[in-house]
């Protein structure tokens, strides 16, 4: 039975939303066991007793969003996140899911779970929506690394392409390099060198992609440095929130005609909202570690966490980590 470590105390809606999500997913995943790390009293109130798929590990501390990541990992040794990461390191759990402090989770992933031998730097990779289909695209790195070298981006592209193929079911994933122009000689020295490395690789490299093309479905995997990727991710998320707010305000607060228009456009608006629903893709994966570590947004509700649980099950089913270990040990 596969064992998934759940940081039950991370996120704004913990532990209730996390427990609700796991209990919803559990009947669909009979081969998985869920190990909850957190406040034992709260866990016992929310979880069924005598369930072979559920285990509770009592912890006494919580890493907060305002905590400094490295210091939190070192000083809050009995926090739900740190204890869960140690269980994964020791082989008592196969994967880790957390909604907690992103920096702390990255730190725990890198320094406790550990890098795969041969991987220079792990990369953080979410799946984002596109306008043309429900397939979405992966973008890596979105903030695990402040600085980058060409070989890092090549490895991220290789791992992300493998993820897109095995977990998302994309045949021959199209890999693109985020750059400031489509031409091969665009960008700084880093991007020019990465372009050549990708072109010389066995990946299905389609060239550069510009920021305005990201949501158009032109690539299945987009590789970028962590600084740029983080800025792009937050820009996409922020723009989406603003558009939704503006639509709601415009349709509901501009008289009877606007409300009638909203009613007539209801199905179309639902279709658009569904297409750009990033929750259905699960969380962001820290690729390149000895075991899967998935970060879901701290504000996630039970529905979003449910998809992250299903995502981890798929990653374990496809044995993605061992694929990476075999590839990078050559």
UniProtKB/Swiss-Prot annotation:
E.C. number: 2.3.1.274
Entry's Gene Ontology cellular component terms: cytoplasm
Catalytic reactions on record: a fatty acyl-[ACP] + phosphate = an acyl phosphate + holo-[ACP]
Enzyme class: transferase
GO molecular function terms listed in the Swiss-Prot or TrEMBL record: phosphate:acyl-[acyl carrier protein] acyltransferase activity
Annotated metabolic or biological route of this protein: Lipid metabolism; phospholipid metabolism
Annotated TM spans: none
Disulfide bonds: none
GO biological process assignments: fatty acid biosynthetic process; phospholipid biosynthetic process
Keyword Lipid metabolism attached: yes
Keyword vocabulary terms for this entry: Cytoplasm, Lipid biosynthesis, Lipid metabolism, Phospholipid biosynthesis, Phospholipid metabolism, Transferase
Cellular localisation: Cytoplasm
Family the entry assigns: Belongs to the PlsX family.
Function: Catalyzes the reversible formation of acyl-phosphate (acyl-PO(4)) from acyl-[acyl-carrier-protein] (acyl-ACP). This enzyme utilizes acyl-ACP as fatty acyl donor, but not acyl-CoA.
Description of how the protein assembles with itself and partners: Homodimer. Probably interacts with PlsY.
Name of the protein this chain belongs to: Phosphate acyltransferase
Organism this protein belongs to: Lactobacillus delbrueckii subsp. bulgaricus (strain ATCC BAA-365 / Lb-18)
């Amino acid at each position: 039975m596969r064992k998934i470590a759940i940081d039950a105390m991370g996120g704004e809606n913990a532990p209730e939303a996390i427990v609700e999500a796991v209990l919803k997913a559990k009947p669909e995943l009979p081969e998985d066991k869920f190990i909850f790390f957190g406040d034992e009293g709260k866990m016992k109130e929310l979880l069924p007793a005598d369930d072979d798929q559920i285990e509770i590990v009592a912890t006494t501390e919580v890493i907060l969003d305002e905590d400094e990541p490295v210091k939190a990992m070192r000083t809050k040794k009995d926090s739900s996140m740190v204890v869960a990461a140690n269980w994964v390191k020791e082989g008592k759990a196969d994967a880790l899911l957390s909604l907690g402090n992103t920096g702390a989770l990255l730190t725990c992933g890198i320094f406790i779970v550990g890098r795969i031998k041969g991987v220079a730097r792990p990369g953080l990779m979410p799946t984002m929506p596109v306008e043309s289909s429900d397939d979405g695209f992966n973008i890596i790195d979105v903030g695990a690394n402040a600085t980058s070298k060409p070989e890092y981006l090549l490895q991220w592209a290789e791992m992300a392409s493998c993820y897109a193929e095995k977990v998302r079911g994309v045949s021959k994933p199209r890999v693109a390099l985020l750059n400031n122009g489509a031409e091969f000689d665009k960008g700084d020295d880093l991007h020019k060198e990465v372009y050549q490395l990708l072109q010389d690789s066995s990946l299905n490299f389609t060239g550069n992609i510009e920021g305005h093309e990201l949501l158009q479905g032109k690539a299945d995997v987009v590789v970028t440095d962590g600084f740029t990727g983080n800025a792009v991710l937050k820009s996409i998320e922020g723009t989406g929130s603003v558009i939704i707010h503006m639509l709601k305000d415009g349709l509901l607060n501009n008289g009877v005609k606007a409300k009638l228009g909203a009613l007539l456009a209801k199905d179309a608006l639902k279709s658009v909202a569904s297409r750009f629903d990033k929750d259905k893709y699960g969380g962001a994966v820290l690729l390149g570690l000895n075991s899967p570590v998935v970060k879901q947004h701290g504000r996630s509700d039970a529905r979003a966490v449910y998809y992250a649980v299903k995502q981890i099950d798929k990653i374990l089913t496809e044995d993605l980590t061992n694929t990476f270990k075999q590839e990078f040990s050559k």
